[in-house]
Amino acid sequence: MARFPQLLFLLLASIGLLSAAQNHSDSEWPLHDNGLSTVVQWDHYSFHVHGQRIFVFSGEFHYWRIPVPGLWRDILEKIKAAGFTAFAFYSSWGYHAPNNHTVDFSTGARDITPIYELAKELGMYIIVRPGPYVNAEASAGGYPLWVTTGAYGSLRNDDARYTAAWKPYFAKMSEITSQYQVTDGHNTFCYQIENEYGQQWIGDPVDRNPNQTAVAYMELLEASARENGIVVPLTANDPNMNTKSWGSDWSHAGGNVDVVGLDSYPSCWTCDVTQCTSTNGEYVPYKVMQYYDYFQEVQPTMPGFMPEFQGGSYNPWAGPEGGCPGDTGVDFANLFYRWNIAQRVTAMSLYMLYGGTNWGAIAAPVTATSYDYSSPISEDRSIGSKYYETKLLALFTRSATDLTMTDRIGNGTHYTNNPAVAAYELRNPVTNGAFYVTIHADSTVGTDESFRLNVNTSAGALTVPSKGSIRLNGHQSKIIVTDFRFGPSHTLLYSTAEVLTHAVMDKKATLVLWVPTGESGEFAVKGAKSGKVERCPQCSNATFTRKKDVLVVNFTQAGGMSVLQLNNGVRVVLLDRAAAYKFWAPPLTDDPFAPETDLVLVQGPYLVRSASLSGSTLALRGDSANETALEVFASKKVHTVTWNGKRIKTSRSSYGSLTASLAAPPAVSLPALSSAQWKSQDSLPERLPSYDDSGPAWVDANHMTTQNPRTPDTLPVLYADEYGFHNGIRLWRGSFTDAASGVYLNVQGGAAFGWSAYLNGHFLGSHLGTATTSQANKTLLFPAGTLRKNTTNTILVIHDDTGHDQTTGALNPRGILAARLLAPSDSSTAPNFTQWRVAGTAGGESDLDPVRGVYNEDGLFAERMGWHLPGFDDADWPANNSTTTRGAQVSLSVTGATVRFFRAVVPLHLPRGVDASISFMLGTPAGASTAYRAQLFVNGYQYGRFYPHIGNQVVYPVPAGVLDYDGENTIGVAVWAQSEAGAEMSLDWRVNYVADSSLDAVRVAAEGALRPGWSEERLQYA
């Protein structure tokens, strides 16, 4: 930048901008509440809870994607430890309503009250999102599948049939939540109505022509919430910047909620980025989106609120193994979340923060078993660099109280002396504290840029640093603070190192700053006169320069942690990125605001979950993944430290901290699956003409009409949901007596579905499936000798659907759209089927297994009979000749085109006092056919769908609680060979990680009630 423009900037900054900021009054913006309570309020700047502004940094987790309540604590403790002030969750109507007369919030993992209680205990607010439609890459968007037949109308409207369907669930969800609101001393602070339902307008929202059907629907939902005790603000989330729905700042057309927000996925919600071009435009990595003007236009008297901001991406069928973590990794977290602050966002929730698993039939057809989502907390519950990077910002937003009330003063490259770098200035109009969000002027560029920044402070206009420069190396952003308040009465005039957190101990302040490894930083503290280096193992060039009443400190941090002591009592901890990753600030209170007077600071471990103080003893809970040095900054009255209940030997440093060493966790090994006794049986007897389908497993498929908007091409109606069978594999037996030469079948099951057909036990053919095909037809000719003369012939169609489509596609039927016999060669008249029968999940909608629930099982013979369940007696099964061993692996073989079920009982005995995660690995040996489908069962839970000819997922995490870590485990695999070549599949397992932990995974896994066993009622479903 030329000298004259720089001087002009400094003059404007010191006169005009400062004046504008100081003259801006809080009273210019109205403070809102909903008329029911003033505990939660909001204005242009932020949410208020109990009269205090809060920066809401939240993240999403789905309890129904990890059906082990004992592990919910693990997830929520990790969210809290990272500095988040809140978390959000979708409920799932379908998970709680197996049929249209049952709403279950009490059985097993359907009891959600522990989530609310944990939020209170841990000190986090909750954003509850009950639907009734949630999307979430869940089958039918979370709808119960009995609502997808057409009998309840087109859904998501005010149709009386649909209203009668959702009301019992929604009322119960509201009633439960009403007991846990901030208005009653608990932690639910807002309640979302519907999900991404941007339907308020007909045509262009600018015309404000209301969609009265949508308005009526929203008003019904809002009334139900209020009638059932919800008094906290009701919210809604616009799916994009084009819909502008449900906010009173935009219109009073009807159906409005209290606070509206905007969802955004700037790098695409799926690894297939082409799916997002209609919303985001052409995908360009690291291209940020502008939100500031949207919030100013659409919701100016409400906070910048993002109920969903991209936390990762789901992996579609045929997506890369392991997803696409590189698309939304460490750099994404660093850049985009800071960018939102530049856009004056003060409430955002990451979707997802923990993704979990699409176990059973939970998923919509868009994705496979894994819902890892490349989230900060991985599917196997491990944490890594993305989690730690996100923690750096979350801890900052929790401690930066001025950030909850800022005006955007300006932005552009004129703030810096490098045209490649821009800054966005946010300033608190009351305190004058400011935040300069620096970023490459072109966010898609990741060059290494050095610059100095023009800032406006209480000491005047400055260009910082005074020595050296600030660096943006790669796709990075930095938030430079000025007049940052911390401690009892201290002011950080500026810092080119980012603030991590600050705490007050014994009435003295500790300020924690960090820089990327090897970079320099400069900060200035008002009121300090001198300082000294207490610890500096890898720092260099630490200098202290007094300028009037300000002490300027310049340093370079090569690695690790340094400690400085200023003469005014302020202790400054300097960290490089790696050290900052393992730096924690656990509160000593359950207050979500985590006041600085109630914090301790801890350096070193993999995870610090919590801290509590009793007398002179500080109790820390957490995880150590290896031998680790521990350093604790706490009150000087602390003389004893315990780690996970055990006292550890500590030493006090010269600067007052306590140091110790944590031992490595014990090694954990798994028994080889190849050493287990594997047995197998054929699981497709239904293909044989001798099979008896007269039992209760089977239902006559004889409907001649349907309310589904998709009329079938032939009758009877062969839509599985019409007959109460909703999940995965269903079987159809069609009978005929007259001669025929073949059959035409058109089957629909969603992307990646497949089907096979048999005549009188003879294999006719299969649709193997593709990642994008949701419907497939085939004309199958009958081979000579397969027809039976003068008696009944039976066609079996086995089809596997991958869930119901989302949004308006929820009603797309699953089953056979057309079934026509072909005329024999000596006739022009095609015969007709005389009967169709269908089988699916044992018991249909009656929910034989309410603990695992209706999503868990399909209609395979093995599942109906309960072969996958613990306690099933396979003693009379013959010795298996369909398995071989390859080292620790077991290889499961199927001869011909059929389904075979393999099972073994494998003991586990993990040590106590550790957390461990285990995954199964499924694969296809080299040279073997991939034309098969497989399902993995662990203690009765279906925890993996493996389609090697379509998808690339080969690693399947299975949580403690589904696995028994100190007992016997029933492992089952159903292998469906879709060609005469048969199939061969390899199976192994591994330990993902082990940590010495306060979370005793063996104890969590001991909850046997989550693993109910086999019962004789299964026998009737043969």
From Swiss-Prot:
Listed SMART domains: BetaGal_dom2
Residues bearing attached sugar chains per UniProt: 23, 100, 211, 411, 456, 541, 554, 626, 777, 790, 832, 880-881
MF term (GO), any: beta-galactosidase activity
Signal peptide: 1-20
Catalyzed reactions per annotation: Hydrolysis of terminal non-reducing beta-D-galactose residues in beta-D-galactosides
Disulfide bonding pattern of the chain: 271-324
Residues the entry annotates as binding substrate: 90, 135-137, 195, 265, 373
Family annotation (InterPro entries): Betagal_dom2, Betagal_dom2_sf, BetaGal_dom3, BetaGal_dom3_sf, BetaGal_jelly_roll_dom, Galactose-bd-like_sf, Gly_Hdrlase_35_cat, Glycoside_Hdrlase_35
Predominant location category: secreted
Locations listed in the record: Secreted
Gene3D superfamilies: Beta-galactosidase, domain 2, Beta-galactosidase, domain 3, Galactose-binding domain-like, Glycosidases
EC number from the UniProt entry: 3.2.1.23
GO CC terms in record: extracellular region
Keyword Cytoplasm: no
Residues annotated as catalytic: 196, 308
GO biological process, one term: polysaccharide catabolic process
Protein keywords: Carbohydrate metabolism, Disulfide bond, Glycoprotein, Glycosidase, Hydrolase, Polysaccharide degradation, Secreted, Signal
Family note: Belongs to the glycosyl hydrolase 35 family.
PANTHER family in alphabetical order: BETA-GALACTOSIDASE RELATED (PTHR23421)
Protein's job: Cleaves beta-linked terminal galactosyl residues from gangliosides, glycoproteins, and glycosaminoglycans.
Name this protein carries in UniProt: Probable beta-galactosidase B
Organism of this sequence: Aspergillus terreus (strain NIH 2624 / FGSC A1156)
Lineage of origin: Eukaryota, Fungi, Dikarya, Ascomycota, Pezizomycotina
